[in-house]
């Protein structure tokens, strides 16, 4: 049987509130919306972490950033960590990554050096884009194109943009002669609609008078929310007034522009390629936009930054919507199942095309960036999302519980409401069990001792249990016996602590 191709498209800073088929807002995302109409739309998909590098780590390694190493921006995965590219390349795929990487431990732009598991002829990270610009153009791109007048005066059209050049390379890849025995995995990773918001002037003109209505979320006084949310709001004041209207034409324009670039790539699939290609679209995280008095992203678990778009179009064009919570952590296992690649033990995710039982998913936050203390510095957060509720443990401040069905805007924190004592305890236990299962290195008994949990006891997570096999690393030997860990019973080791 012919193995399928994969076209994996992602954006940066584009939560469900910025995609028309999810939000219902008059934002032009017609290409993404068309993909949703032809495929499977996941309505409760969550990022692994609402910050760039940790989110991408979950996506491209299949394990959480706390496991792989980059628990904050500008930290790279460990050298023993395998990626999507490695798994697929070793399975005989032509693996190609074009665009923003933000996973090499360097700065936002990256080093420009292609990892060995991807095709170096198509690698085009931020540093590669910068190498094509003059010093004047670099200065313009980062700080000088903030208005219609700026764009017109500098004659900026789509050919100047990183997004357009990414799309050019992706289209070129698709136009190359097919190799009969080598299916492809191509990742197309756009920076837009992330800052610096560069797009042709006609897109910016569209949104000059557009105001995004936040509704009641703009009125949240944060009185019953964690302290660090209030500190964040004070340090970075929201631009949204009492009218609840968010005005950011550059952001909206780039959101529109990147949709057209996505359309260019998807429409470049030949009929033969389309018959055998799974198309996957998602984003790394969102932007608060003034909701709950917050801007940017950071140590919060509101849907504005954690609930991301996820659409999967099969070659056969199966159409449906899925409301069950899923995670970026599930994408690599799902793709491996479709490609008939054996999933290694280390990957905790599931094939979300086959999930039928109710489930929960975890979201984490630890620190925004290694070099500075934005959003309070080290603020460890763990979140558990189910069909009906969202529990947020803020280790250093206070916790949150939201009713997802009756309070989708997350205005009412129910953590101290005794009516939900059973719900919060069951979710708390499920989250602690999951942290134990994945061997979250930030696990400690403090996560179990929450003031609202009257039956709380210090919870010990067990003794030495080695990392599950990833299919590449040498077998770990048990400390006590010196034997390969496959011969050691994990449960016995847990009880020994």
From Swiss-Prot:
The EC number(s) given in the record are 3.1.6.-
| The keyword Hydrolase is assigned to this record | yes
Q: Which SUPFAM superfamilies match?
A: Alkaline phosphatase-like
Q: Where is the signal peptide?
A: none
Write out the residues that bind Ca(2+): 12-13, 52, 284-285
Which PROSITE patterns does UniProt cross-reference here? SULFATASE_1 (PS00523), SULFATASE_2 (PS00149)
InterPro entries according to UniProt: Alkaline_phosphatase_core_sf, Sulfatase_CS, Sulfatase_N
Q: Which cofactor does it need?
A: Ca(2+)
Q: Which CDD domains match?
A: sulfatase_like
Q: What does the cofactor field's note say?
A: Binds 1 Ca(2+) ion per subunit.
Enzyme class at the top of the EC tree = hydrolase
A GO term for molecular function? metal ion binding
Question: What are the 3-oxoalanine (Cys) sites (modified residues) in this protein?
Answer: 52
- The active site lies at 52 (nucleophile), 102
> What domain of life is recorded for the organism?
Bacteria
Pfam families cross-referenced by the UniProt entry: Sulfatase
PTM annotation, UniProt: The conversion to 3-oxoalanine (also known as C-formylglycine, FGly), of a serine or cysteine residue in prokaryotes and of a cysteine residue in eukaryotes, is critical for catalytic activity.
Keywords assigned by UniProt?
Calcium, Hydrolase, Metal-binding
Question: PANTHER family attached here?
Answer: IDURONATE 2-SULFATASE
* Family according to the record: Belongs to the sulfatase family.
Q: What protein does this entry describe?
A: Uncharacterized sulfatase YidJ
Organism, by scientific name, is Escherichia coli (strain K12)
Please name the gene that encodes this protein: yidJ
């Amino acid at each position: 049987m012919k193995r399928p191709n994969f076209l994996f498209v992602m954006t940066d800073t584009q939560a469900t509130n910025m995609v028309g088929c999810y939000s219902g807002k008059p934002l032009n995302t017609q290409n993404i919306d068309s993909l949703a109409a032809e495929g499977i739309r996941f309505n409760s998909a969550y990022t692994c972490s609402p910050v760039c590098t940790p989110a991408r780590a979950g996506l491209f390694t299949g394990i959480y950033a706390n496991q792989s190493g980059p628990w904050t921006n500008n930290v790279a995965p460990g050298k023993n960590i395998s990626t999507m590219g490695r798994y697929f390349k070793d399975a005989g795929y032509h693996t190609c990554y074009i665009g923003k990487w933000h996973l090499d431990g360097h700065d936002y732009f990256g080093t420009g050096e292609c990892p060995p598991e991807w095709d170096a002829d198509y690698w085009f990270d931020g540093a590669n884009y910068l190498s094509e610009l003059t010093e004047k153009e670099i200065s313009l791109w980062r700080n000088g194109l903030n208005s219609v007048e700026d764009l017109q005066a500098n004659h900026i059209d789509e050919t100047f943009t990183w997004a357009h050049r990414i799309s050019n390379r992706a289209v070129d890849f698709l136009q190359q002669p097919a190799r009969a025995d080598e299916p492809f995995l191509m990742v197309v990773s756009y920076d837009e609609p992330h800052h610096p918001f560069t797009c042709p002037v006609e897109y910016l003109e569209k949104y000059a008078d557009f105001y995004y209505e936040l509704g009641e979320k703009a009125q949240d006084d944060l009185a019953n929310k964690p302290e660090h949310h209030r500190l964040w709001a004070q340090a970075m004041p929201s631009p949204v007034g009492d009218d609840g209207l968010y005005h950011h034409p550059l952001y909206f324009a780039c959101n529109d522009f990147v949709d057209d670039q996505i359309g260019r790539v998807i429409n470049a699939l030949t009929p033969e390629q389309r018959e055998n290609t799974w198309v996957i679209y998602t984003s790394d995280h969102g932007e608060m936009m003034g909701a709950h008095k917050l801007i940017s992203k950071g140590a919060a678990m509101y849907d504005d930054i954690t609930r991301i778009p996820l659409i999967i179009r099969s070659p056969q064009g199966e159409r449906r919507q899925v409301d069950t919570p899923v995670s970026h952590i599930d994408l690599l296992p799902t793709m491996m199942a479709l490609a008939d690649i054996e999933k290694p033990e280390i990957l905790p995710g599931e094939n979300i095309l086959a999930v039928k039982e109710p489930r929960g998913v975890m979201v984490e936050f630890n620190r925004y960036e290694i070099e500075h203390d934005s959003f309070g510095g080290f603020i460890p957060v763990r979140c558990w999302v189910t069909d009906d509720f969202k529990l947020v443990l803020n280790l250093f401040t206070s916790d949150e519980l939201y009713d997802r069905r009756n309070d989708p805007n997350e205005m009412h924190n129910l953590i101290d409401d005794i009516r939900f004592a059973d719900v919060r305890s069951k979710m708390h236990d499920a989250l602690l069990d999951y942290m134990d299962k994945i061997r979250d290195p930030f696990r400690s008994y403090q996560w179990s001792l929450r003031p609202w949990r009257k039956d709380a006891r210090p919870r010990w997570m067990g003794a030495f249990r080695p990392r599950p096999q990833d299919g590449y690393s040498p077998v770990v030997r048990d400390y006590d016996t010196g034997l390969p860990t496959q011969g050691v019973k994990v449960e016995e080791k847990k009880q020994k602590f």
